[in-house]
């Protein structure tokens, strides 16, 4: 690997202030060098295996699908150390930070999962972590805030704007503009300016690679579809990457429909957005007629982002991937169903993918194999869901 493409079709690019371009160029070169360095790869794989717990399991659902001739598998990223897929690429970027000779890490977080992953990687590798989090998210994700602080990270609440993920990204980028000589901005999703979408995809690629090997071992063939939730789109691109060149495998991303796509309260950037630039990349974003960024909404803090990674925008445009949307209510139902039927409490983000996969399974032909990326576990969401349901679960 000697060069990275900065765009996916028309999407992507590096739309940032000029003073950040040297930092992004340095990051791209460090990543290319690392990808070609067997020692870096060895250290990364050792951390993934011995610290994070890869490979993660693939579980056949026993009780969710009514048709016994349709198989629904769960790729268990919820079992990864840190509680979600986020740990994969954070370990990779933290190693890159050290490789560049930097001592500090800046990050943004929504649900707090990326923040937790950043905090644990920085604790392990001796880096100082500053994590920006929307004030609203600090309130609804209190356990993760305490986890981050417990592991030595500084958590900075952001009151600007709507006090959510978009605003946290703005503050993190502002910080990085002033400190990039000693700090690395550890972006948490497959969005943002080049080279972030490519780096994040490559550091999550093992999700799809393991899925391929596991399904071949269990079924002797590739799945008919892989399904993953999409906010910025990192867990989905990690799942999709190894299957993009396999036309027999449907790639299905699931966006948050919130209170319904007919309302203003959703986060479906591909489903309802238009093209534009946000956080350094050209992609589908939620904006009004004047180009002002609209507030995204989802019951799940981690999907509450008003744009989508540029490779997803491209996969949508060329028809290689399909993007559906699932409402809060559908996701909450799937959250409870998996808990009650299988004893696995999924993250609200992952519950969106599960809800859509269950609908697919209901309509699927005999012999269909579907894999859902269970991107995280639901511990962080228990208090939030408890308050929504008023302590009642839907029997």
Curated annotation (Swiss-Prot):
Keywords: Amino-acid biosynthesis, Aromatic amino acid biosynthesis, Lyase, Pyridoxal phosphate, Tryptophan biosynthesis
The EC number(s) this enzyme carries: 4.2.1.20
UniProt GO molecular function: tryptophan synthase activity
Keyword field contains Glycosyltransferase: no
Cell membrane keyword on record: no
Residues the record lists as N6-(pyridoxal phosphate)lysine modifications: 86
Cofactors, names only: pyridoxal 5'-phosphate
InterPro entries: Trp_synth_b_CS, Trp_synth_beta, Trp_synth_beta/beta-like, TrpB-like_PALP, TrpB-like_PALP_sf
Pfam (any one): PALP
A cellular-component GO term for this protein: cytoplasm
Pathway terms, separated by semicolons: Amino-acid biosynthesis; L-tryptophan biosynthesis; L-tryptophan from chorismate: step 5/5
Catalytic activity: (1S,2R)-1-C-(indol-3-yl)glycerol 3-phosphate + L-serine = D-glyceraldehyde 3-phosphate + L-tryptophan + H2O
Similarity comment: family membership: Belongs to the TrpB family.
Function in brief: The beta subunit is responsible for the synthesis of L-tryptophan from indole and L-serine.
Assembly description: Tetramer of two alpha and two beta chains.
The protein's name in its UniProt record: Tryptophan synthase beta chain
Source organism: Pseudoalteromonas atlantica (strain T6c / ATCC BAA-1087)
The gene coding this protein: trpB
